[in-house]
A protein has these predicted regions:
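Polyanion-binding interface signature
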Residues: 1-137
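Charge-dense, extended regions
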Residues: 133-169
Length: 169
C-alpha cells in the first residue's frame, strides 16, 4: 500500500515516488483457491504458461471504483502477485483518501513520511482487505472493487459465511 513512501525507483536518484503510488499484494493462496476467477480461460497459478502463450506479463482489465471512476488495471508482477492501476496513484489515492490520508507524498527522498497505512489504521476503520467482483459474470474485462470488512478475507479463504453489512441488504 505504501509504495509511494519507498525509496526512489532508480538507484542513486533523489526523485521521490509519485504521490499515492500503490499496489495491492495478492497472496498465492488466493490463486490456489480460485485460479480461474478473473477469467475462466486463464489459470492464474500458471504465470509462466500465461506469459509464454500470450507474450504478456500481466492481465489487463478495467477496475471500477465505488465513486464511479474506472481505470485501466493489471494483475501483474511475477506469479500475478499484485493488483495495480494505470496510473498507480489511482488505486492508492482512493485507498488513502478513504482512510484519511489526504497527501500521500514524501516531501524528500531521504525522509520517509509518517502518514502511512498500517494494519492498526485499517483496523480502526474496520477494514483489512478489498473485495473484487464481476457485475456481469461473463464480462472478464470489468472488475469492481470496494473495501471489505475486517476478517472478510480470512473468512473467504476458509469458506466461512461472510457478514453482510446492513446497508447492502
Amino acid at each position: 500500500l505504501n509504495a509511494w513512501n519507498g525509496n526512489p525507483k532508480t538507484r542513486g536518484s533523489q526523485r521521490v515516488r509519485p504521490g499515492g503510488e500503490a499496489y495491492l499484494p495478492i497472496p498465492k493462496d488466493l490463486w490456489n483457491k480460485c485460479p480461474f476467477w478473473i477469467n475462466p480461460s486463464i489459470d492464474m497459478r500458471d504465470y509462466a504458461g500465461y506469459k509464454q502463450e500470450t507474450g504478456q506479463s500481466s492481465y489487463k482489465f478495467n477496475l471500477h471504483f465505488p465513486n464511479g471512476k474506472v481505470y485501466p488495471a493489471i494483475i501483474g508482477q511475477a506469479n500475478f502477485k499484485s493488483l495495480e492501476t494505470k496510473p498507480q496513484s489511482a488505486l492508492g489515492k482512493w485507498i488513502f483518501n478513504s482512510l484519511g490520508v489526504e497527501h500521500p507524498q514524501r516531501e524528500r527522498y531521504d525522509e520517509p513520511s509518517d502518514d502511512i497505512i498500517t494494519m492498526d489504521r485499517l483496523m480502526r476503520f474496520g477494514l483489512d482487505s478489498v473485495k473484487l467482483w464481476h457485475e456481469d459474470p461473463n464480462d472478464y474485462k470489468n472488475v469492481w472493487i470496494d473495501f471489505a470488512e475486517y476478517g472478510s478475507f480470512e473468512r473467504f479463504m476458509k469458506d466461512e459465511m461472510q457478514v453482510q453489512d446492513e446497508s447492502e441488504e
